[in-house]
Amino acid sequence: DYDSMDALKKATDKPLIIINESMQFSAGVNLTYTMDFANKGDFKSIEKFIKYFQETCKHLKYSEHPVISAPSGLTLGGGFEVMVQSNFVASHTNIVVGLVETIVGLIPAGGGCKEMLARWLDTEEAKKDPNYAPLKVFDIIGYGKTATSPVEAEPMKYLRPSDKKIMNRNSFCLLYTSDAADDRVS
């Protein structure tokens, strides 16, 4: 919703840790919210909402300060797109992560496609074959593939090798004080 996006955009003027105290990080955009606009034929509002989400993700990606995401539970769709813009991720071992929009006939719109392609282009296979990365990303996103743990998420490039994996949710904030964030986030 707009309130969440406003809070994220405004918070990028300082080091930021994105965490949700509930069991789920984010299952993505509330589709009922956007369907209400569609049912009324108000497609301008949908366009405005998507553009605002894209701008929010861009603020996270290009913040002058470290942005750390601490996902747990469901981290899907727009939730993944928020996480993937972060400089660093400290993921709980109980995570379900992925871009699942295609399962409901949508295309990820918050930068997830771009970030996935960038991660896959950085592989040895992609350096040998220019078709490798786009086909791999198309397969993952097109089928709405999810990973159900950090162990599964890393080879799918949902998580990077440098991202932390944490078993105890109470450890998230202990890992990163603002001083530690400046030292650990590149």
Outline where the language-model segments fall.
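A structural preference for short, pocket-lining loop segments at secondary-structure junctions
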Residues: 1-44, 51-70, 92-96
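Conserved catalytic cores of soluble enzyme domains
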Residues: 46-50, 54, 58-178
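Anionic group-transfer/hydrolysis microenvironments
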Residues: 21, 32, 74, 103, ...
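Single conserved hydrophobic/aromatic residue that forms the stacking wall/gate
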Residues: 179-186
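Single, functionally critical "micro-switch" positions that shape active/binding sites
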Residues: 29, 86, 181
